[in-house]
Amino acid sequence: MKKIPHELTHMAFHGLVKYSDITVEGYPKIQYHGFIGNNRTAMLVAMNGYIDWGCLPNFNSNAVFSSILDKNKGGYFAIFPSDTTDVYVDQYYKEMTNVLVTEFVKNGKIILRLTDFMPDSEYGKISFPEVHRFVESFSEPIDITIDFKPTFNYGQDKPIIEKDQHGFIFTTDKESIGISSEFPLRKNSDRIFGNVKMEPRSSSWIIALYGIHHLFRTTDYKSYLRLQETTDYWRKWASSSSYAGAYHSMVMRSALALKVLFYEPTGLMVAAPTASLPEAIGGERNWDYRFTWIRDTAYVIEALSSIGYKYEATEFLYDMMDMITRDNRIRTIYSIDDSNDLEERIIDYEGYRGSRPVRIGNKAVDQLQIDQYGSIVRAIHSMAKAGGIVNSYLWDFVEQVMAKIEYLWKYPDSSIWEFRTEPKQYVYSKVMSWAAFDSAISMAKDLGLSAPIKQWKSIQDEIKKEVLEKGFDTDTNSFVQYYGSKNIDAALLRLPILGFIPANDEKFLGTLSRIEKELMVDGYLFKRYREDDGLKGDEGSFLMLTFWYIEDLILMKRLKKAREVLESVLEKANHLGLYSEEIDEKSGDFLGNFPQALSHLGVIRVAPKLEEALLKRTSKINS
């Protein structure tokens, strides 16, 4: 690969954080978390040694650990030094893996190390609903605290706790979870607890196991072997990427994070492994993201294909198609399995730092979001451009979707931001309908497929004509959020990316100018809109918007600015290179569900595009 014209530095992620600074109001800050997973579920691991979120056995199961949503009622699995005075913490992943290491440091020396993982291997269909935690002391003896308190059905189902020869087992009518350890632990009310003195340079495993009724010796779980298998699995997967370009460490960390979010039994991906982490502290914008969104399909395929995972991208599309076929309709959101249990309910938790309500399930499943139809057609087109085969099954599906868009595009909807107000004629949804016809026509022509191209082109032209007439406001010289509105919408950043209008067109430049003036904060972060959406309170800056902005800058050939913005947002990643959905532009704190697939898809999409543009410019200069 040619050398890029500028030294694009890799980001140095991890650094020490004072133990007492990790929590605010009794809750670890969202950014002070890592996560581990096994392609069925994932656990958040805070820098203070707490696993404070985790659903077992699957992403969409009830959370066994949920203290991130209620520090008193929620469950957790904690290991930390008993005396945290003047203790600092570092946290990092073993290179090119999702094996997480947390180190507690005092007076410049490591005093305690935790290595956390969930077993995974190339034999993906073999499930290990287990959390393995390796505890190591160093040159001095150390007192540690172990505190294990799982909860069931968000505290509604009270477990029986029984001592086993090799640990303890929590059992309800429907579920069970055990903890196996060689440390001396005891029952303390509704939890298992231990203050343990570790001798210098000693170590031991603690394992949480879901769905068991009998425990074996800790050594029988072969944690060292499982750790090696898991390490090999992640490194083998990472090494199969073809990407070796700029910001490699950030791109690969995003890819590894994304890979965890796939649910292996069906191949579908959750938008995030968490529920109800707030978009504003104390606010009500708290949603469950443990589902698959149709509109994410195209992003996933484009991103994975761009760094060499074409097989995974194609497989994801077919898995998504399989789910749609079984359901016999296109819905906004799908469960990752066949449960179809998306009903939204409120649980009696105080919420992260008092952010209520705490929602489980997602009501957006019932909305009409017309842009999703364009997303699935563009996903198939993206797969085709990456070398995938559009067979008769896929093409028949495309024609069915296009027939639906032919009449749906004129309807009001809730659009990309899933407004819970009355449906409107959102410009973004119209443009996505236009983009669907654009992709379908291109596939028909490029692949020699039978299609009513003339009819499609006529409808596509009609959509564009209407959007230019009703969706562009001459007074403000910009496209607007919906017909008849003066409001601006950051989703309009995608107009050039979708090919609806050139990036240097005066109409888009006017739109971009308004977005920069009215929605941009801190020079590179963006609010989604200023429209009253019927919800109380504000929200943070939506990180995916920054990556769309960078794509626009690349299309406008403003490469220096694109690079500056990209490096600025990369510096906003946490100590592990992870992102949430949003960020508080004032404090820098993460907001929303974490880690967020869309944010990481943005990293993966933009870095290769910027490098390619820089290489082309250099080649042109040198020719």
Curated annotation (Swiss-Prot):
A Pfam family of this chain: TREH_N
GO MF term list: alpha,alpha-trehalase activity
Keywords per UniProt: Carbohydrate metabolism, Glycosidase, Hydrolase
Thermal activity profile: Optimum temperature is 60 degrees Celsius.
GO biological process, one term: trehalose catabolic process
Subunit structure, as described in the record: Monomer.
Annotated source species: Thermoplasma volcanium (strain ATCC 51530 / DSM 4299 / JCM 9571 / NBRC 15438 / GSS1)
Description of activity control: Inhibited by validamycin A.
Pathway noted in the entry: Glycan degradation; trehalose degradation; D-glucose from alpha,alpha-trehalose: step 1/1
Annotated function: Catalyzes the hydrolysis of alpha,alpha-trehalose into two molecules of D-glucose.
Family, per entry: Belongs to the glycosyl hydrolase 15 family.
Protein known as: Trehalase
Top-rank EC class of the record's enzyme: hydrolase
Assigned EC number: 3.2.1.28
pH dependence: Optimum pH is 3.7. Active within a narrow range of acidic pH values (pH 3.3 to 4.0).
Outcome reported for the amino acid change (mutating residue 571 to Q): 4% of wild-type activity
Catalytic activity of the protein: alpha,alpha-trehalose + H2O = alpha-D-glucose + beta-D-glucose
